């Protein structure tokens, strides 16, 4: 068994949709990035890639490549799952933490868990998504951006 950790940060932008965990969350601002800027799925992708010693999301999906402009991070996560499978690994458990002040995402967490589990052919009960504020501290507290952390456990098939 191997453990991976991932973190991702994106700043808010008024001309973007807020996509988190593959769910479009109603919000006056979205996250800025080369792809759809799904901060949660990016952190998970990094955790999985790291656990398998396959590098990071930037290595596999560089933001300098037009191929990934506005890319759907659900598709990127599916690709990460295939890379793990090619190396003989499967995800066992994923635990995540999303930090943002607004909007509240509690109504969307179950769909996010379903999306993540579906992308990686996992049981939804093995995927955890949690959210908290930053108590108005730092860039998250000032609502300048959002951050996500992910920890995963993978094992050889």
Swiss-Prot record:
Site location (Transition state stabilizer): 34, 133
Cross-referenced PROSITE patterns: ISPF (PS01350)
Alphabetical list of Pfam families matching this protein: YgbB (PF02542)
Catalysed reaction, written as an equation: 4-CDP-2-C-methyl-D-erythritol 2-phosphate = 2-C-methyl-D-erythritol 2,4-cyclic diphosphate + CMP
SUPFAM superfamilies the UniProt entry points to: IpsF-like
Pathway: Isoprenoid biosynthesis; isopentenyl diphosphate biosynthesis via DXP pathway; isopentenyl diphosphate from 1-deoxy-D-xylulose 5-phosphate: step 4/6
UniProt keyword annotations, A-Z: Isoprene biosynthesis, Lyase, Metal-binding
E.C. code: 4.6.1.12
Family under the similarity heading: Belongs to the IspF family.
Oligomer status and interactors: Homotrimer.
UniProt-recorded name of the protein: 2-C-methyl-D-erythritol 2,4-cyclodiphosphate synthase
Species annotation: Chlorobaculum parvum (strain DSM 263 / NCIMB 8327) (Chlorobium vibrioforme subsp. thiosulfatophilum)
